Amino acid sequence: MELQGLNDFIFWRYDSNGNVITDSDKGGVTYDGNKGKVFDPKTKEEFKGLFKVDLESSKGATQANLTGLAESVQRVYGSNYVAEITTGTAQPQAALAANDIPHAVSDTLIGLVKDELGGYARKGQAKPTQGGLIIHSYNPWNSIDFYFAFPMGIYVPGELNLQTNAENPTVVHDAMTLNAQARGTDQLLYEKFYSNEPGFDYGKMIKFITGQSAVDATADNKKATDTQGQPLSDH
């Protein structure tokens, strides 16, 4: 299916028990009003602890480059022919970028710890930051919203290269990478969602990927809905 552009992406952090961190004093995200908050389009329920990187909250998401989706292949030869083929485990990565994520959000996501001096520090033996990610794109020809979801992974910071020249300063944007891993409860590595599928429901997708529901409940609703929670047949 053709996809055009990057609408937004949503990220969050987990605590040591695998629960989404909702308390900003314990490593959760902070908000400026409703900017960055994620809501269920049907019930208007807020999904606490999640942050949406979009035009309003971060001057726009600019990149979600996915690599490592394919399994590695190893060929075993015998008698001058390929006798056996084995496949390894996929090792996905999502390289993310945005124009202006609030620093309190991006620094916390990559594991920096705020101190009383107004700084965000990383010590020599930093603990990995576990979190998840949902990337949102769109197919305009069939009006399909597409979501690529990673329920679990480790966030690491991107590089920072500050420069200037004789005329203009060089603009540097936010960058980070999610190294995906399978979720322990169900071994889910990643999942694709399509808004035109009969079982799709935005709110249930969020709850399933973030671990707020123990099973995939998206199949309970057999009527496809758009991102506003309205049945497609009503359009």
Regions found by a protein language model. Name each.
Residues M1-K59, Q230-H235:
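Polar/acidic, low-complexity leader/linker segments enriched in S/T/G and N/D
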Residues L3, T43, P102-T129, N196, ...:
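Core alpha/beta structural scaffold of self-assembling particle/tube/pore-forming proteins
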Residues L6, Q91-Q93, Q130-G132, D145-Y147, ...:
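Extracellular structured ligand-interaction cores
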Residues E56-E84, G88-Q93:
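N-terminal, charged/glycine-rich beta-strand/loop interface patches
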Residues V82-V105, T170-R183:
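Oligomerization/assembly interface segments of phage tail-like spikes and tubes
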Residues I85-G88, R122-Q125, L162-V172:
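Exposed beta-sheet edge/beta-hairpin loop segments within beta-rich domains
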Residues I110-L117, A121-Q163:
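Short helix-loop boundary/capping segments
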Residues G153-H235:
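Mixed-charge, glycine-accented linear interaction segment located at domain edges/termini
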